Amino acid sequence: MIDRKIILVIGNCGSGKTWVMRQVKGDGRGHKKLGKFVFHENDKCIIVGKYAGHVFDGSDRLSMSVMTDLDHMIEYIRSRNKITLFEGDRFMNKTFIKKCDPFIIKILDSGKDGRNNRGSNQTDRQIKAIQTRVSKISADQEVLDSNKCLALINRIIG
C-alpha cells in the first residue's frame, strides 16, 4: 500500500493519536529501550512511545531530547525491516521528517471531545501552538478521525 516503512501520525491535541497506537499495540506488556527511545515491538511493527495507561502516554512519555538518539533508532528500524509508527508532537519537526521521510497521516478531528473526555488541562496557548504546527505539515493521507486512522494503519500493516 505504501513504500515507506516509517509512518507518522499527527493531529490536534485530543484527536486520538495515542488511542490509535494503543489499539495497534494491543495487549503486549513490555517495552524496549534504545537510548532515549522507548518502543513496543510485535511481529508486524514497531510502535514508538511508552504506553502504560497514563492520560498522556505514547510519545508524550519520551524525553524532550529524544531526537538526539534518532540516528540510533533509525539504524534499529532498518535492521528490523518492519513498519514503524511514530505519533505526536515530539516528531512533528523538520529534522525527523527530513531524516525519516515518513508517510504522514493527519487526523483532521479538532480534538475537543478527546480533550474533554480525558479532563485535559492543556492551556489554550499549548493547544493553539500544536494546531498551528499540525496545519503547516503536509500529509500523505488525511483522515477524519482516529477510527479512520486506525483502519488505515491496520490495512498498511496487514
Residue ranges and their predicted role:
Residues 1-4:
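Phosphate-binding P-loop
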Residues 9:
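Hydrophobic anchor at the beta1->P-loop junction of P-loop NTPases
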Residues 14-16:
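Conserved glycine(s) of the Walker
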Residues 18-30:
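A conserved segment at the C-terminal end of the G1
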Residues 37-90:
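Conserved nucleotide-sensing/catalytic segment adjacent to the nucleotide-binding pocket
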Residues 63-75, 120-135, 150-153:
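Well-ordered, non-membrane alpha-helical segments in soluble/globular domains
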Residues 87-88, 99-116:
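Conserved phosphate-donor/acceptor-positioning beta-strand/loop module used by diverse small-molecule
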Residues 135-158:
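NTP-dependent small-molecule kinase module
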